[in-house]
């Protein structure tokens, strides 16, 4: 445990039952939602498409994250401290990082596939089962390789300040440890966010151009619209814009707190108390709950 955390008194005992209730609620919703997503997609023949393999992979990574992290969190919240030993602390942090990284990059590939279909259209190469499987394999191999690095001295997995979980060491002043967090932030936050925004900007532009083309064609044909009245009220352009805004907003809400905790820990640790460290994984784990809704349903 870093000496920084000894500067603070123990957390209010009421925080632990509140966190336990939140984790219980989140854990049940996440496991149930992602299990149903996996079961429906794997048992419905019409849904077993290459693109939906990515959705299933997202559900699996979110399910595994909560399945491996939910029970230890319940135990540590009950005892008000980490009681599972240093080895499991590292395993716990590794699994959390691995599943989180896999989820993030699966979302990126889902977005890229939508970009390929909508923006490039017939000019784009259609996603095959082989290609989707290769993407999924690449996601897990790279995520595993990246998250194994702290076991070999590039940063470390240590207890969080609230002592209910473990994660990367963002309080170390060692340049090697910090370099890992710089690359980590780029790999799992800035780059995926940039790709997501880029893809959705061009998706919205492409759909807007298509909508304009349909309106122009309707004028040439001397009719008000090629769509019926109900479809006009909720045009594809508006629906897609809402999905894009929701996706980017939820991404930002889910992962920004954890990023800020890491960077504040590196550069302004005096502002970082044990209570604040809770919010990072609270928002990140909530992401695993609404992913099935955002990606499977949309």
UniProtKB/Swiss-Prot annotation:
Glycosylation sites: 162
GO biological process: phototransduction; visual perception
Subcellular localization: Cell projection, Rhabdomere membrane
Record flagged with keyword Cell membrane: yes
Residue intervals passing through the bilayer: 16-40, 53-75, 90-112, 132-152, 180-201, 243-264, 276-297
Key words of the record: Cell membrane, Cell projection, Chromophore, Disulfide bond, G-protein coupled receptor, Glycoprotein, Membrane, Phosphoprotein, Photoreceptor protein, Receptor, Retinal protein, Sensory transduction, Transducer, Transmembrane, Transmembrane helix, Vision
PTM note: Contains one covalently linked retinal chromophore.
Coiled coil: none
Intervals, Cytoplasmic compartment: 41-52, 113-131, 202-242
Main location: membrane
Assembly and oligomerization: Homodimer. Interacts with GNAQ.
Protein's name according to its UniProt entry: Rhodopsin
Organism, scientific name: Procambarus orcinus (Crayfish)
């Amino acid at each position: 445990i870093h000496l920084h955390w000894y500067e603070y008194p123990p957390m209010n005992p009421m925080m632990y039952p509140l966190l336990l209730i939140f984790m219980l609620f989140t854990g049940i919703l996440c496991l149930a939602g992602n299990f149903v997503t996996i079961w429906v997609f794997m048992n419905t023949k019409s849904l077993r498409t290459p693109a939906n393999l990515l959705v299933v992979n997202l559900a699996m990574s979110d399910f595994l994250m909560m399945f491996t992290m939910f029970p230890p969190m319940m135990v540590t919240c009950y005892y008000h401290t980490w009681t599972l030993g240093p080895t499991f602390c590292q395993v716990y942090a590794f699994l959390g990082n691995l599943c989180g990284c896999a989820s993030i990059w699966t979302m990126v590939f889902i977005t890229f596939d939508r970009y390929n279909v909508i923006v490039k259209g017939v000019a784009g190469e259609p996603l095959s089962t082989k290609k989707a499987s290769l993407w999924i394999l690449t996601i897990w191999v790279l995520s595993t390789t990246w998250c194994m690095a702290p076991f070999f001295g590039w940063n470390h997995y240590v207890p969080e300040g609230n002592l209910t979980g473990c994660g990367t060491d963002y309080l170390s002043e060692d340049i090697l440890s910090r370099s890992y967090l710089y690359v980590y932030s780029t790999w799992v936050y800035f780059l995926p966010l940039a790709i997501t925004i880029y893809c959705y900007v061009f998706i919205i532009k492409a759909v807007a151009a298509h909508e304009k083309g349909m309106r122009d064609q309707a004028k040439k044909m001397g009719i008000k619209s090629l769509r019926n009245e109900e479809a006009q009220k909720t045009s594809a352009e508006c629906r897609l814009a809402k999905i894009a805004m929701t996706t980017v907003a939820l991404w930002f809400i889910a992962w920004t707190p954890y990023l800020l905790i890491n960077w504040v820990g590196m550069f302004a640790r005096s502002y970082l108390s044990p209570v604040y460290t809770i919010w990072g994984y609270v928002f990140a784990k909530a992401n695993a709950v609404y992913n099935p809704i955002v990606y499977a349903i949309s």
